[in-house]
Amino acid sequence: MLKIGPYEMESRLLLGTGKFDNEEIQTKAIEASGTDVLTFAVRRMNLYDKNLPNPLANVNLKDFVTFPNTAGAKTVDEAIRIAEIAKHAGVCDMIKVEIIGDDETLLPDPIATYEACEILLERGYIVCPYIAEDVVLAKRLEELGVHAVMPLASPIGTGRGINNPLNLSYIVKNANVPIIVDAGIGSAKDAAEAMELGADAVLLNSAVSRAKDPVKMAEAMKLGIEAGRLSYEAGRIPVKYTAQASSPSEGLGFL
């Protein structure tokens, strides 16, 4: 069971809803993923004008926890304003704080993110910041009172997988809030690796929506995350630098 603030989810896969070729594929991929949480950029949603296109028109949002994000924000004020729009529209009081600090790499701005989280927490939001794989920042945000921390695997949309498994493992080890690996996942292998490192969940979008077969990839991600979590809970064998026979040595005297 994944718990973020007051929200409880069976699935540890959080799915982004953008970049699908059409609504039919999007709907089938959501179903195949088994997710309980759908995340979306507030600026993409027409929250006040029902006459404008709605990218989630065919999805019964009552079946999911909706998880808006502040994608597109470059300043603290922009992130706060986007969060307020989502809350006032009755979408959800849980917000992914995403403030981009560099247009080329799309890496998050750590200072602005911290400041925005501080304000949103004071206003009663369930706050989940998106950050680089910064061990110290992750801990400082937890101490601030955020409800989950969302370190990237690699830059948004690159599909490079986990660039810094060591830092992610440090973040997980030191955490007392859920750690959700977010951005850069390219395959089910990457998702499984994140879970094997001890992450509580994985958030992904492009890896599914831009796959050759998004529906199959959604199912693959579901299974990869489940396998990775089971592997983490089972406990892998220690890494050794010398070979160790797996067959018993007893009985060799009879040969």
UniProtKB/Swiss-Prot annotation:
Pathway: Cofactor biosynthesis; thiamine diphosphate biosynthesis
EC number: 2.8.1.10
Keyword Transferase: yes
Record bears the keyword Ligase: no
Active site: 96 (schiff-base intermediate with dxp)
EC main group: transferase
Domain of life: Bacteria
Pfam families the UniProt entry points to: ThiG
InterPro entries: Aldolase_TIM, Thiazole_synthase_ThiG, ThiG
Family: Belongs to the ThiG family.
Annotated PANTHER family: THIAZOLE SYNTHASE
Protein purpose: Catalyzes the rearrangement of 1-deoxy-D-xylulose 5-phosphate (DXP) to produce the thiazole phosphate moiety of thiamine. Sulfur is provided by the thiocarboxylate moiety of the carrier protein ThiS. In vitro, sulfur can be provided by H(2)S.
Protein name (record): Thiazole synthase
Organism: Staphylococcus carnosus (strain TM300)
Taxon lineage: Bacteria, Bacillati, Bacillota, Bacilli, Bacillales
Gene field: thiG
